[in-house]
Amino acid sequence: MADRMTQLQDMINEMAGLMTNAIGVLQATAPPCEFGAISQELEDEPNCAIFAAGIAKAAKNIEILIDSFPIEAGNQEAEVEEKMIKNDEKQREKVNELVGLVGDSNRLVGVVQKKLAEISKTQMSSRPSE
C-alpha cells in the first residue's frame, strides 16, 4: 500500500510539473493579442494540444492507480460513502462559488477594458495634431 501511495504522490507531482511547464511555455510563446479577441494564431497553437494530451494522460494514469487501491470491507464502506457524499456537496458549493467568482472577474475585466479604452482615447485626443 505504501508503494502505491508513493507512486500516486509521484504521479501527482508529475502532473503538477506538466501543468506548470505548460503554463510557462504557453506564456513565453503566446503572441500578443487584443483584449476580448482570440486570434487565429492562438487557435492554431500546436503546444496547447501537446500539453493537454500529456495532462490528460497523467490524469488517466492517476485515476487508474486510485482505482487499484483496495476498498476495506465492513462498516468502513458506509463511512466512505458518507464522506464521498459530503465531499460531493462541498465540491458543488465550491463550483458554485467559483462560477460566481468567474462572473465577477469577467465583469471586472469589462470595467478594466472600458477604462483602458477611455485612457487610450484621452491620450489620442491630447496629442497635438500634425
Curated annotation (Swiss-Prot):
One term under GO cellular component: mediator complex
GO biological process annotation, one example: regulation of transcription by RNA polymerase II
InterPro entries named in the record: Med7/Med21-like, Mediator_Med21
Any coiled-coil regions, as ranges: 71-99
Origin: domain of life: Eukaryota
Chief location bin: nucleus
Molecular function terms, GO-annotated: transcription coregulator activity
Keywords: Activator, Coiled coil, Nucleus, Transcription, Transcription regulation
Localization per record: Nucleus
Role noted for this protein: Component of the Mediator complex, a coactivator involved in the regulated transcription of nearly all RNA polymerase II-dependent genes. Mediator functions as a bridge to convey information from gene-specific regulatory proteins to the basal RNA polymerase II transcription machinery. Mediator is recruited to promoters by direct interactions with regulatory proteins and serves as a scaffold for the assembly of a functional preinitiation complex with RNA polymerase II and the general transcription factors.
Subunit organization: Component of the Mediator complex. Interacts with let49/mdt-7.
Membership in a protein family: Belongs to the Mediator complex subunit 21 family.
Protein name as catalogued: Mediator of RNA polymerase II transcription subunit 21
